[in-house]
Regions:
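C-terminal cap of thioredoxin/glutaredoxin-like
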Residues: 11-15, 20, 81-173
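Structural alpha/beta surface segment adjacent to cysteine/selenocysteine redox centers
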Residues: 2-84, 89, 156, 164-173
Length: 173
């Protein structure tokens, strides 16, 4: 939720360490799913649509970063300017944003989260996966938790479990 202050805090304080220590090293795969809390964050859905419109031109993460950098002060009138700043084709971006065609994707993301018990932002799942589907167990973390106190220990624990699994004869590989 690009309008959520706790999501913004996670993005600014916790995400850089997770990215540096786990994602960039290939130890984990990070999947971002939209979960705009529209009943309290009225601008969050359109911001999510803007990120997906940028994704059509290969710039999801760059738009993601710009939107979170706004600290909740989202202005749909600025989205085309952000797109231009990223070097996107502005007409195509604006057409995408005005069409609402990304709405179905956002609805699927929300339904997916809701189906596994997500009801707040930010929320994270640390689990073993296969082809993007959650395969076994997992921990749901809700709220902007500190990296050192929460994520690092859970990610290390998950990494040890996966290493142990791959070393046994039970491995499907």
């Amino acid at each position: 939720d690009f309008e959520c202050p706790f999501c913004q805090r996670h993005f600014a304080q916790t995400w850089p360490e997770i990215k540096r220590n786990y994602v960039d090293t290939g130890k984990v795969r990070y999947v971002f799913l939209d979960f705009p809390l529209e009943q309290i964050h009225f601008k969050a859905r359109k911001a999510a649509e803007a990120a997906h419109c940028a994704a059509e031109q290969g710039k999801f993460w760059e738009m993601h970063d710009i939107l979170f950098a706004q600290n909740g002060n989202l202005d749909v009138g600025q989205y085309v300017n952000y797109a231009k700043k990223l070097g996107l084709e502005a007409f195509a971006f604006d057409l995408c944003l005005g069409s609402g065609k990304q709405s179905a994707k956002i609805n699927r993301n929300v339904a997916s989260g809701t189906s596994i018990g997500i009801n707040a932002t930010p929320s994270f799942i640390i689990a073993r996966s296969e082809r993007g589907d959650i395969v076994s167990g997992g921990n749901i973390i809700t709220g902007a938790q500190p990296y050192r106190d929460c994520y690092n220990s859970l990610l290390l624990q998950a990494q040890k479990l996966i290493t142990r699994f791959l070393a046994t004869d039970d491995s499907p590989c």
